[in-house]
Amino acid sequence: MAASSSLVPDRLRLPLCFLGVFVCYFYYGILQEKITRGKYGEGAKQETFTFALTLVFIQCVVNAVFAKILIQFFDTARVDRTRSWLYAACSVSYLGAMVSSNSALQFVNYPTQVLGKSCKPIPVMLLGVTLLKKKYPMAKYLCVLLIVAGVALFMYKPKKVVGIEEHTIGYGELLLLLSLTLDGLTGVSQDHMRAHYQTGSNHMMLNINLWSTLLLGAGILFTGELWEFLSFAERYPTIVYNILLFGLTSALGQSFIFMTVVYFGPLTCSIITTTRKFFTILASVILFANPISPMQWVGTVLVFLGLGLDAKFGKGAKKTSH
């Protein structure tokens, strides 16, 4: 993908990355819901899929295989000199962010978690400035704030209070803060690889997923989840087909994500991945004629305003040439 992307004109590269991420993860989301929320079996013996670690493990394996194929056919000339510890650190921070974000839902409500995750570009930018001494134009800061505010407003849906919701105050917010910090560290690691080692997108994708596979593999063996999953798959073999498709859409989506990181940096990647969910919901609203509240219209305007201003005035971050 990295090699083939050189055939794409510069002006089309960013739209290609955005569309690639959007289309792949749109179908990825459908498959994810089908796998994790579907009912298996009949009558009183119906079961649900509860093997989250195994699902992510298979996803990482498919990603790694896909990246290896891309390197073999399109990227053989590139020599990867990136330090292994950087890949390991990146995979640890990525997995940690994902686990922290999901665990936070035990202590905070969904809107709070969404608001936290929508702020992902902020730690990427802050850590990039503080640790890497990277400079962004003021317009970039304003555009990121507009986009984050727009996505948060669009996705926020106040619930009607039916009873008293109690949860431990502070712990959930701490987990979200940890998740955001780890997201930022992942972005800093990727930025460091780009700046000092000119790491290719395919090599980045391969090695981060290999390390993630190693960590998750140890996890599912230690917990015994792997054997429970194999027993489940034996009872419902169609799950294997859906999981493989799920892994393939993830691999394609990740190849576009890593290509975005290499050519445009982790901040732009964060903007794309943050707004992806917004556009997915927007497409759902258009296709199924779901109503949009005034607050969501404000969010829509802010996101498109932020994206438009960023395209026109937000340039200025130094890019690695390939």
UniProtKB/Swiss-Prot annotation:
A motif (Di-lysine motif) lies at residues 318-322. The chain crosses the membrane at residues 12-32, 51-71, 85-105, 136-156, 168-188, 210-230, 243-263, 285-305. One of its GO terms (molecular function) is UDP-galactose transmembrane transporter activity. SUPFAM superfamilies: Multidrug resistance efflux transporter EmrE. It comes from the Eukaryota. It is a multi-pass membrane protein. The keyword Transport applies. Keywords: Antiport, Endoplasmic reticulum, Membrane, Transmembrane, Transmembrane helix, Transport. ATP:ADP antiporter that catalyzes the exchange of ATP and ADP across the endoplasmic reticulum (ER) membrane. Imports ATP from the cytosol to the ER lumen and exports ADP in the opposite direction. Regulates ER energy metabolism and protein biogenesis. Appears to be part of a calcium-dependent ER to cytosol low energy response axis, where calcium efflux from ER to the cytosol triggers ATP import into the ER lumen to maintain sufficient ATP supply. Provides ATP to ER chaperone HSPA5 that drives protein folding and trafficking in the ER. The di-lysine motif confers endoplasmic reticulum localization for type I membrane proteins. Belongs to the nucleotide-sugar transporter family. SLC35B subfamily. This is Solute carrier family 35 member B1. It comes from Bos taurus.
